Amino acid sequence: MKNLFIGVDFSKEKVDVAIIFADGLTETAARVFNEFKTTVSGYKQLVKWVEQNSCGIDSSLWLFCGENTGDYSKGLCNFLYGKGYDMWLENAKSIKDASGLRRLKSDRADASMIAEYAMRNYDKAIMYEPLSESLAQLRELFLYRQMVVRHRCSFQVRRGEKRLTMEKSPIKTMISQSGRHIVSELNKEVEKIDKRIAELIKSDEELTEVFTIVTSVPGIGTQNAVCLMVYTDNFRRFNYDSRKIACYYGIAPFGNDSGTSVHSDPRVHYMANRQIKAMLTQAALAAVNFNPVMARYYMRLVERGKKKQVALNNVKNKLVHLVTAMVRNRQTFTPEYKISA
């Protein structure tokens, strides 16, 4: 049981902090507030301030909590983890939805709301653990590659539009040549990133093992494998639970029933990481074409009357369940794997 809950509201240049003293769900003292810079010295001042205002409560009974804001939250979380403090990094929407109607919006109020959320939902807390150094580097490379590919696609589309809409002129020629050069350079950059990703995976024994297992499934290529590894912390983030991974990917169907008048067939929810969901769609399409096991499964569903998009989503689910089980059991794919309908 924790008795000191520290809510942290992250921003680019500072963090706002609120402390709640509690015995169970009962607050035992007035809340205290402060703000600190997002620097190592600022983090040290934060911890020192909490110690001074902890009323003698041992640090093992503290719980820091904040919204997952990506890079903004990473610095303090890694600092607290390195010092041995418990840090809970929660989804921002979960905190907002659980906090009810709020009229006041300020950094201080947000920090207070986060601290209260931590107090009331302590039993759901998942303590923060940073990615391994190799996996963190792999994540940065993967995200950088995604950005470069988006820019390349943007220039390719732009060049195509100009080719169709502009009359021949020196300006059109200049734009076309410049665009061609930029696309060529971006292609070289993608190749460089792919080479670095391969070197990084090869240099780490665990990454090599998991990557080999995942890519042994026909239809799952390098980028889908890296995507799975990065977003699931080598499948440990969800404790090898394929249902949770499918939910995170946005491919798990959910029903909508209420009383006697509201009823709809289960369907996937809009809340998902759409970028990685699109990548899994590509993997499913490749699996249907090149993986005999998945192809037979897909055709059985279509023959039963399933719509093709529904059948394809089922293939995505099967891929996630299959890959998760293979990584958990440390086994590579063989055609003898049985996929139940």
Briefly describe each language-model feature range.
Residues W62-G75:
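Acidic, metal-coordinating catalytic cores used for nucleic-acid/nucleotide bond scission
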Residues Y81:
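Anion (oxyanion) recognition and catalysis
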Residues S216, T222, V226-R304, K308:
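Phosphate-backbone recognition surface of nucleic-acid-processing proteins
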